[in-house]
């Protein structure tokens, strides 16, 4: 009888202690991967990719050249003003009178693991790395090759020894393996203060991978910056979701939002992970942003929408 009572005591004690353990966030799955806040997965089967590849054969995917404005280097090097410079694709130089931030830096010719194949840049960067002012922080939204470019981040880390790389959960190891040590990974809603600027990593609807077998093993998201003078959010890549309303609820409205408007066709394969221009406007309204800049267009031909349409939309 005593043995039975002892067993029951140990069983219920173990159950109670398990219940009191902190549970992982809902977007942390048991297999070590991550999920969107609403659980919506990105599904791209081999059959779908082959169908898309076949359909693209009959489409006009020619590039569209447009005139580039020269950066205002006087303002950029002054550092006493709030200046946001679109360098191309989703790369921005953001200066808020406190720190200089570079988002998703991509300065090379291809968005690809290969230097001789893959989507080729058809518009040069608005600035070259050697023309940049001092950079305090580099943010990476997710691991795709058009957002995390090895050669670009390596050159930046070599030029600016003290630059801090802020990356999604799971990506810190990649940077350390590449010899970049000053890196900090954040989960959704984690914040870090750099000088007088609060930087928060927020959820959006997307996915991650750098190879065939690492789907969603690292997180993805948006970067929100706020100090006394200004607030800015860089959404990265994202489909339309309620995440924008939650960002507004938790972090407040922003002065400026960098919103992706490209890489959205065909909708039957891109809808979950990329907004079209109409959805981009909806995200702008959800965020209650004062101003917005369209990004993720005019640099690489990644999907099927005409570039001329994006030029008009932006």
Question: Which residues fall in each region the model found?
Answer:
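Metallo-beta-lactamase
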Residues: 14-120, 125-131, 168-234, 255-262
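Acidic/histidine-rich helix-loop elements
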Residues: 107-124, 207-215, 265-274, 301
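Active-site metal-binding motif and surrounding structural segment of the metallo-beta-lactamase
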Residues: 117-167, 252-258
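Active-site-proximal loop/helix segments of hydrolase catalytic cores
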Residues: 151, 208-287
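Conserved small/polar residues in nucleotide/adenosyl-binding loops
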Residues: 312-313
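Sec-dependent N-terminal signal peptides
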Residues: 3-12
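Active-site neighborhood of phospho(di)ester-bond hydrolases with catalytic His/Asp-centered motifs
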Residues: 103, 135-143, 166-168, 233-238, ...
